[in-house]
Amino acid sequence: MHIGKLIKQRMDEQGKTVVWLARQLSYSRTNVYKIYDKASIDTDVLLRISSILEYDFFSLYSDSLKDDKSNVPN
């Protein structure tokens, strides 16, 4: 799972811009682009982005754990 790509995808779906997210986070546009490039990010940042975009990115990790457990032989 590449969280940066998933954040960008959600932004695109919502029609939000890099400038908009940068303002919401009080980050530079460069830092938002760096987030898009990251496979993982700090949980505090992910929590803020989840709140701003009104989307639970943490559920993607939970779902991934469930999928992993279902693929493990007993």
Protein language model features and the residues they cover:
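Short, charged recognition helix plus adjacent turn
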Residues: 9, 34, 61-74
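Key DNA-contact positions within bacterial/archaeal DNA-binding proteins
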Residues: 19, 30, 58
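Recognition helix of helix-turn-helix/homeodomain-like DNA-binding domains
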Residues: 26-41
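Short, basic-rich loop-to-helix N-cap that marks the start of a DNA-contacting helix
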Residues: 38-51
